Regions:
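Conserved non-catalytic scaffold segment of RNase H-like nuclease domains
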Residues: 1-92
Length: 92
């Protein structure tokens, strides 16, 4: 598949503490940025959700409370994520 881009496009994937959009939080976010010239940039961040990760959720994605205990919160990462996606179209 060939893309004809006028702006960069960022594809993103998240892992979370669950599927409830009101109470659950992100524990990992990955972004792949593709530029119109074909260059690529990618980043993955672990995120401290500031709440326990249920064992049944850890069994799905493998991310435990211990793994994110010393990671930044989403609020602490938000500016870096914004810097990566600010000039791009988004795709999930």
């Amino acid at each position: 598949m060939e893309l004809s881009l006028k702006r960069p496009i960022c594809f993103f994937d998240i892992e979370s503490t669950g599927v409830n959009v009101v109470k659950d939080r992100i524990v990992e976010i990955s972004i792949l940025k593709i530029y119109p010239n074909g260059n690529r940039e990618s980043r993955t961040w672990l995120v401290n959700p500031e709440m326990p990760i249920p064992p049944e959720t850890t069994a799905i994605h493998g991310i435990s409370d211990e793994k994110v205990a010393n990671e930044p919160t989403f609020k602490q990462l938000a500016h870096r994520i914004h810097d990566m996606i600010k000039d791009a179209d988004l795709a999930g």
